[in-house]
Swiss-Prot record:
Family matches, as Gene3D superfamilies: 3.30.1390.10, Single helix bin (1.20.5.710)
Protein name as it appears in the record: Large ribosomal subunit protein bL12
InterPro entries recorded: Ribosomal_bL12 (IPR000206), Ribosomal_bL12_C (IPR013823), Ribosomal_bL12_C/ClpS-like (IPR014719), Ribosomal_bL12_oligo (IPR008932), Ribosomal_bL12_oligo_N_sf (IPR036235)
GO cellular component terms, A-Z: cytosolic large ribosomal subunit
SUBUNIT field: Homodimer. Part of the ribosomal stalk of the 50S ribosomal subunit. Forms a multimeric L10(L12)X complex, where L10 forms an elongated spine to which 2 to 4 L12 dimers bind in a sequential fashion. Binds GTP-bound translation factors.
Organism: Chloroherpeton thalassium (strain ATCC 35110 / GB-78)
Molecular function per GO: mRNA binding; structural constituent of ribosome
Amino acid sequence: MASIDELVEEIGKLTLTEASELVKALEEKFGVSAAPVMVAGGAMPGAAGAAEAPAEEKTEFDVVLKSAGASKINVIKVVRAATGLGLKEAKAVVDEAPSTVKEAMPKADAEKLVKELKEAGAEAEMK
């Protein structure tokens, strides 16, 4: 068990970029995806009542950088300003496009960030 605890500690020390690279490497090595698995509504007890309720409007959005475009430097500046990442980490996010720039943002903030990225020459979207 000590080796597992040590591994968890080492993973906890990774930067966001390094953690992203680790996830990609594990996905490739083991042929899996880190995407959440969708559960069929009928499989869970009590899901029938939840299925009848009207769909809730989404309140939190992820901003995804699809491509940096021609003016990569301007896009890196916008990513740094929005995320607080250092130059190296922001550059890695831009270089690894398509990548998530920021997660769980309110709709207005996400729209503003997408607009700023597009003005900088990037291709971005809200999910």
